[in-house]
């Protein structure tokens, strides 16, 4: 067992579900970057399993001080790479290395609500690595939550809404700018999003993905996804509230986008704001704020 009692850490405010801490927190062995990479290669399978069981794993003590160090550690785990260029993320981000990019370049006053990464698209990663290069003097924590726990509580507190989400799925709509908009949390241009240079190429990609679309007079592009699932079967008896419902309904707001038009059920019917508030309140209840320290690494299972 790699993660024995000597490796385990206690983090203030840590949650516990079914006798398992969330997140699991461990201390990596001390050493140089090469030794950290060797450690990562040795624990890759167990760390992935732990992230699935616990939801997330916080690792402290790795010798990571730069995006390049982070890239080296991530490469050592040898998980499949899911690059920013390959994604359909609507967030504007900066690539530092082929595997490392910023979480979001929106101004700090923009609220980014809890969500599963890229679940508003048909293409999404199974895991996410986060790294803290410099800890904030104040604030700066990253909230994460167990969506399997959220789903169980939503079914208890609002079964009709939970049933509708499960049966109908969701569709998302947003307007992509013709040029990058760094003032928005969703300011990635349609050219960057779809890796194209022309409208014709964008339309071909959209058609292949099953999207509908409408060009705006100013060159922006309004798109609507095909029906996407709101709930994911985790294959071990658990299900998770796997979507971007809360983030889209409450947070997809900028000069182009109105949250009220950002999401519907799969059949086109509107969501009841009161139902979304219940889901959001539960998410906040089960959320844990990662108290970053410089050099911390976190592995989050995007499905859980």
Where are these regions (language model features)?
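Acidic, aromatic-enriched beta-alpha/helix-loop junctions
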Residues: 47-57, 78-81
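Polymerase palm active-site segment centered on the conserved acidic dipeptide of motif C
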Residues: 80-91, 214, 291, 297
């Amino acid at each position: 067992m790699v993660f024995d009692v000597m490796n385990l850490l206690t983090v203030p405010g840590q949650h516990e579900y079914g006798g398992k801490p969330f997140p699991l927190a461990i201390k990596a062995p001390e050493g140089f970057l090469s030794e950290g990479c060797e450690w990562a290669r040795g624990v890759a399978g167990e760390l992935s399993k732990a992230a699935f069981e616990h939801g997330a794993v916080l690792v402290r003590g790795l010798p990571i001080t730069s995006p390049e160090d982070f890239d080296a550690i991530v490469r050592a785990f040898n998980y499949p790479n899911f690059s920013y260029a390959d994604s359909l993320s609507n967030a504007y981000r900066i690539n530092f290395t082929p595997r490392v990019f910023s979480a979001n370049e929106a101004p700090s006053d923009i609220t980014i609500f809890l969500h599963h990464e890229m679940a508003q698209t048909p293409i999404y990663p199974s895991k996410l690595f986060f790294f803290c290069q410099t800890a904030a003097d104040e604030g700066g924590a990253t909230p994460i939550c167990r969506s399997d726990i959220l789903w169980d509580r939503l079914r208890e507190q609002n079964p009709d809404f939970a049933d509708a989400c499960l049966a109908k799925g969701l569709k998302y709509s947003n307007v992509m700018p013709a040029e990058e908009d760094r003032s928005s949390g969703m300011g990635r241009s349609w050219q960057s999003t779809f890796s194209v240079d022309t409208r014709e190429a964008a339309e071909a990609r959209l058609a292949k993905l099953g999207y509908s679309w409408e060009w705006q007079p100013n060159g922006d592009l309004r798109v609507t996804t095909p029906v996407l699932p709101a709930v994911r079967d985790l294959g071990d008896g658990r299900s998770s509230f796997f979507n971007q419902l809360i983030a889209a309904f409450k947070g997809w707001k900028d000069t182009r986008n109105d949250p009220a038009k950002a999401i519907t059920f799969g059949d086109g019917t509107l969501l009841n704001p009161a139902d979304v508030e219940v889901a959001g309140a539960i998410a906040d209840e089960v959320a844990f704020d990662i108290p970053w320290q410089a050099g911390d690494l976190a592995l989050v299972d995007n499905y859980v």
